């Protein structure tokens, strides 16, 4: 389940009432019967893509959902154009957010999905040059668009060769950075 911060911030990004609707759906699901012998809450993982609008809500969101869902994971917004206002630039503020997630991981080791090594990569460029993945193992996850065409250079890219490409040197994707943290790199 993707949440963009606490209710007020999430709703400012996704539309009024969307947070409460998502919350109600999750709480309704987890109040239901067990699934294959395990509690329903074990099925639910939350992911938050951190950006310039919601970075202040990381701790509050994690604490709000603790003991309600199984896991929460964090990644950072990846821009497609220079100057994207949602991108949280490398530097002091972003480093503080990463350090906050590391502290949460130490406090809730079985709840926070990110490893310290993986989230620490988010303090700087870990995988690309411009829109070209260099260290990134984008080859490890094959992604298709709605027509079955391969998306390039990665899961948020486009199958259109002339389409906008994500700026790899500002990548904040968790699905690839976790592979780099495990020692898997680009060709």
List PLM regions with ranges.
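Radical SAM enzyme [4Fe-4S]-AdoMet core and its adjacent flexible, acidic
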Residues: 2-151, 158-166
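Radical SAM enzyme core and accessory elements
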Residues: 147-150, 157-187
């Amino acid at each position: 389940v993707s949440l963009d911060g606490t209710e007020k911030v999430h709703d400012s990004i996704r539309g009024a009432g969307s947070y409460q609707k998502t919350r109600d759906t999750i709480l309704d699901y987890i109040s239901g019967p067990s699934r294959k012998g395990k509690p329903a809450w074990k099925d639910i993982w939350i992911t938050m893509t951190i950006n310039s609008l919601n970075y202040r809500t990381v701790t509050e969101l994690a604490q709000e959902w603790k003991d309600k869902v199984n896991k929460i994971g964090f990644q950072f917004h990846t821009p497609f154009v220079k100057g994207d206002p949602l991108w949280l630039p490398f530097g002091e503020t972003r480093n503080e957010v990463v350090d906050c997630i590391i502290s949460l991981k130490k406090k809730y080791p079985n709840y926070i999905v990110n490893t310290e090594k993986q989230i620490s990569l988010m303090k700087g460029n870990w995988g690309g040059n411009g829109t070209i993945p260099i260290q990134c193992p984008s080859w490890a996850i094959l992604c298709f668009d709605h027509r079955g065409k391969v998306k390039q250079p990665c899961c948020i890219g486009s199958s259109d060769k002339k389409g906008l490409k994500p700026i790899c040197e500002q990548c904040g994707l968790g699905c690839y950075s976790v592979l780099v943290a495990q020692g898997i790199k680009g060709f």
